[in-house]
């Protein structure tokens, strides 16, 4: 191993080259900061900065007194995977929608007229495009173009890849959607965590992230996962004013719960923004297996995405688009969405009420599938004790850009929660907290 360089960028690049060539294997230890600084004749802070960039890019990881080592393939948490649901545990961990509130995909695929396209055919179903344009036009008051991607995560990855390079800083919510953490780590981007409260991203935290050099912002306007927070009109205006001072920053709004959200959409993208996209996945209200998201974006951003989703290469299956179109145009599906909106709001609200009755405060009424509960005990210990009692939930640290954060929180998926379950779970969580308090004294 021969690390070279006199600047943080050069040192980090040297390590990356050796990792790519295989000279530095996963879990190989990097020299201590003091030792490498002496060998290279540079300040210790220069080496420390290089190592920090390697960690932020997912190339290396820190192990406390064990030093800094080359990272193995990232083991990233995902929705529904590794959620700790075993045996007879009640699943409040998966993050999934209620299957009974999803329409029949196979029936929709068989309806209407469908002609299998050949190479060179339009990449987007014309009728789906017409529907999407009308839907977006209700919320966007600036020129836009539409296209279809393989889901919201695919859209976010492609948008970041189209505008950013490895090592660029991206402002993301804290806590945030699991896939956002994975997208940044796998893409080699650095994260600038922006704290979230009941009204969404906090203006002071966004301002700090932009001052630190964030080149993109990923924001959830409503039904934020994991907290259930939604932007208020006032908060959206504050964020819009801040972003207006940074017109070149890429703004991605992930409106994943649009059709079944109980909250209105409040736009954070300012009129003068030159690079932006509004992404609306259909997974939460048409089904996770319908890998499709509708995207509205400025002309330049759309052109960059189209180059990566052109007919004949990586376009979204027209059969999937046909299925989505049939469902989105079906009045019966609209009625199902109205019912889903009502039931999801009722279930999450019921859980909040039952928790409050047990002395566990959730400071705002969430929207979406999940409820974020902050506790005054260790979240992992609470998750383990709840599992022993027959309840599966997810620990808060999984949703933090910095895994050391949100150690005292849990996320509870309330999508299928019944009233008896809400009552029982709240009592069990209160018992768990009391038991953990007693063992700590």
Where would I find each of the regions flagged by the language model?
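Short glycine-rich anion-binding loops that position phosphate/pyrophosphate groups of nucleotides
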Residues: 97, 222-224, 284, 417
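N-terminal basic, amphipathic alpha-helical segments
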Residues: 1-118, 130, 134, 310-317, ...
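Residue-level detector of anion-binding/catalytic polar loops
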Residues: 169, 190, 250, 361, ...
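Hydrophobic residues in beta-strands of the RecA-like P-loop NTPase core, especially within AAA+ ATPase
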Residues: 172, 253-254
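PLP-dependent aminotransferase class I/II
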Residues: 278-356, 362-363
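Conserved core of the PLP fold type I
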Residues: 116-246, 259-277, 437
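Short strand-turn motif at the edge of the Rossmann-like AdoMet-binding core
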Residues: 222, 255-257, 282
């Amino acid at each position: 191993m021969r690390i070279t360089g006199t600047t943080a960028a050069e040192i980090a690049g040297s390590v990356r080259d050796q990792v790519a060539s295989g000279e530095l294997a996963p879990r190989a230890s990097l020299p201590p900061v003091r030792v490498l600084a002496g060998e290279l004749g540079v300040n210790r802070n220069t080496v420390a900065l290089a190592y920090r960039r390697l960690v932020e890019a997912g190339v290396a990881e820190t192990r406390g007194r064990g030093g800094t080592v080359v990272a193995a393939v990232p083991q990233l948490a995902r929705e529904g995977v590794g959620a700790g649901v075993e045996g007879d545990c009640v699943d409040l961990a998966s993050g999934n929608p209620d299957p009974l509130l999803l329409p029949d995909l196979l029936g929709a695929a068989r309806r209407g007229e469908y002609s299998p396209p050949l190479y060179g055919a339009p990449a987007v179903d014309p009728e789906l495009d017409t529907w999407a344009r009308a839907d977006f036009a209700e919320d966007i008051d600036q020129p836009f173009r539409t296209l279809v991607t393989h889901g919201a995560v695919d859209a976010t990855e492609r948008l970041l890849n189209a505008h950013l390079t490895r090592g660029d800083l991206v402002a993301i919510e804290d806590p945030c959607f699991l896939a956002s953490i994975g997208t940044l780590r796998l893409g080699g981007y650095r994260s600038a965590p922006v704290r979230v409260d009941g009204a969404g991203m906090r203006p002071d935290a966004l301002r700090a992230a932009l001052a630190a050099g964030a080149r993109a912002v990923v924001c959830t306007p409503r039904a934020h996962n994991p907290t259930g927070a939604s932007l208020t009109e006032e908060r959206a205006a504050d964020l819009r004013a801040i972003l207006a001072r940074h017109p070149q920053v890429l703004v991605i709004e992930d409106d994943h719960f649009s059709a079944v959200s109980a909250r209105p959409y409040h736009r954070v993208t300012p009129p003068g923004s030159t690079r932006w996209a509004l992404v609306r996945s259909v997974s939460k209200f048409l089904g996770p297996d319908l890998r499709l998201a509708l995207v509205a974006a400025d002309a330049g951003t759309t052109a960059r995405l189209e180059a990566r989703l052109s007919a004949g290469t990586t376009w979204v299956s027209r059969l999937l688009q046909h299925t989505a179109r049939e469902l989105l145009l079906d009045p019966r599906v609209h009625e199902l969405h109205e019912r889903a909106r009502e039931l999801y709001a009722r279930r999450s609200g019921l859980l909040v009420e039952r928790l409050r009755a047990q002395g566990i405060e959730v400071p705002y009424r969430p929207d979406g599938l999940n409820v974020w509960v902050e506790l005054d005990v260790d979240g992992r210990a609470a998750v383990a004790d709840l599992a022993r009692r027959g309840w599966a939930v997810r620990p808060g640290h999984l949703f933090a850009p910095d895994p050391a954060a949100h150690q005292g929180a849990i996320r509870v998926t309330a999508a299928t929660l019944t009233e008896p379950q809400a009552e029982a779970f709240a009592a069990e969580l209160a018992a768990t907290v009391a038991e953990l308090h007693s063992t700590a004294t």
